[in-house]
Amino acid sequence: MTSETRTLYSQLPAIDRLLHDSAFLSLRDRYGHTQVVDLLRRMLDDARDVIRNTQTLPDWYADWAQEAKLRLENAAQSALRPVINLTGTVLHTNLGRALQAQEAVEAVTQAMRAPVTLEYDLDGAGRGHRDRALATLLCRITGAEDACIVNNNAAAVLLMLAATASGKEVVVSRGELVEIGGAFRIPDVMRQAGCTLHEVGTTNRTHAKDYRQAVNENTGLLMKVHTSNYSIEGFTKTVEEAELAEIGRELDIPVVADLGSGSLVDLSQYGLPKEPMPQQLIAAGVSLVSFSGDKLLGGPQAGIIVGKKAMIAQLQSHPLKRALRADKMTLAALEATLRLYLHPEALAEKLPTLRLLTRSEASIREQAQRLQARLAARYGDEFALEVKPCLSQIGSGSLPVDRLPSAAMTFTPHDGRGSRLEALAARWRTLPVPVIGRIYDGRLWLDMRCLEDESRFMEMMLK
């Protein structure tokens, strides 16, 4: 160790002296003595590393309290930080999918603050069933005989297969052997459930006779999987759910369906593309239908299964059901969301997912044009700002081909350097409320479809 290094080490303050500084007293009040002391020890270690490697004091040496404050604030930030989603993907899986309705937020808050009748029957003063209230609602909305709730749709598919067809064959069209995010594949789920996959048809064409010919003494289920995250076009043929249900009745084989996104309303009435609805499949005679809670339905993450009472009873009594069951917060949010569907006239106003999906291109463009001048005053020296037409997508594997006309604020660097776009996007990600856009075709695009809180957005962008 050189004499210069020893001199620099000697200038480092003692923890006890720092703790009695007035600035650190306020930090101790806010974050606690233990956390502040632990931080100061790490800061001293960092300072020694700087001295050892550079023979200089750290650049924050003159204001230990300010550096400590910044580090404590960063450490205190939640891992789940609110962001402003201007990616153009409404149901963005990486950003949490569906925003919850105010009614759902209030229901979750109430469920967290007090004991609730999760599994308590007020009438009989005994044990109740946690799915009961939601099952009643879901039956009313879909026309099913009963319903079951688990923590996501992948779990719902696993439970359906394990409880009703373990040790048996499940017949599925080859064109419906989907893979969704995280390498979740239908064949893999079947193996986990103890089922044997029996593929029929080809990738692009499957006929009713293929299902009939596949049925044997070991067939447990006929299964339909909605290909919600891709589309096969051209020379194609599929067997619709109603026809497959008729085959199932003829051969006395239950038919189950994985709808994936699962919309409870006819989206075409809002000018959106049609998606199959659980109530249509139930009316067609499908025995069990599963779908997600946090996609087109607009609620919390959940797997919902509706269908025949006897088969739902099999699911409820299976050991996996307890492992996959939903908690009280999920059930509270889902119940509040489902109740919105009982008042369909107000649904597009109260349900954030539907509200964002149904925004008109004209209103989005008007919003972008209104904000353009103020943003140009802040960023115009480096970037050309334009309002351009763009196409939003629904996201989360819902309606993969269809796009929604929208409008975006675009930022193009005057010098044409792509690195400026990367730097700008990175800067926005460090904001107190990060702004997330996308870089494409030499521009940074902010699709305004999902922008509802303009004041917060402008506060961030003008920092």
Swiss-Prot record:
<dbReference type="GO" id="GO:0001717">
    <property type="term" value="P:conversion of seryl-tRNAsec to selenocys-tRNAsec"/>
</dbReference>
<dbReference type="GO" id="GO:0001514">
    <property type="term" value="P:selenocysteine incorporation"/>
</dbReference>
<dbReference type="Pfam" id="PF03841">
    <property type="entry name" value="SelA"/>
</dbReference>
<keyword id="KW-0963">Cytoplasm</keyword>
<comment type="subunit">
    <text>Homodecamer; pentamer of dimers. Binds only one seryl-tRNA(Sec) per dimer.</text>
</comment>
<dbReference type="InterPro" id="IPR004534">
    <property type="entry name" value="SelA_trans"/>
</dbReference>
<keyword id="KW-0711">Selenium</keyword>
<comment type="similarity">
    <text>Belongs to the SelA family.</text>
</comment>
<keyword id="KW-0663">Pyridoxal phosphate</keyword>
<feature type="modified residue" description="N6-(pyridoxal phosphate)lysine">
    <location>
        <position position="295"/>
    </location>
</feature>
<dbReference type="GO" id="GO:0004125">
    <property type="term" value="F:L-seryl-tRNA(Sec) selenium transferase activity"/>
</dbReference>
<dbReference type="InterPro" id="IPR015424">
    <property type="entry name" value="PyrdxlP-dep_Trfase"/>
</dbReference>
<dbReference type="InterPro" id="IPR025862">
    <property type="entry name" value="SelA_trans_N_dom"/>
</dbReference>
<comment type="function">
    <text>Converts seryl-tRNA(Sec) to selenocysteinyl-tRNA(Sec) required for selenoprotein biosynthesis.</text>
</comment>
<dbReference type="InterPro" id="IPR018319">
    <property type="entry name" value="SelA-like"/>
</dbReference>
<comment type="pathway">
    <text>Aminoacyl-tRNA biosynthesis; selenocysteinyl-tRNA(Sec) biosynthesis; selenocysteinyl-tRNA(Sec) from L-seryl-tRNA(Sec) (bacterial route): step 1/1.</text>
</comment>
<dbReference type="GO" id="GO:0005737">
    <property type="term" value="C:cytoplasm"/>
</dbReference>
<protein>
    <recommendedName>
        <fullName>L-seryl-tRNA(Sec) selenium transferase</fullName>
        <ecNumber>2.9.1.1</ecNumber>
    </recommendedName>
</protein>
<keyword id="KW-0648">Protein biosynthesis</keyword>
<dbReference type="InterPro" id="IPR015421">
    <property type="entry name" value="PyrdxlP-dep_Trfase_major"/>
</dbReference>
<keyword id="KW-0808">Transferase</keyword>
<dbReference type="Pfam" id="PF12390">
    <property type="entry name" value="Se-cys_synth_N"/>
</dbReference>
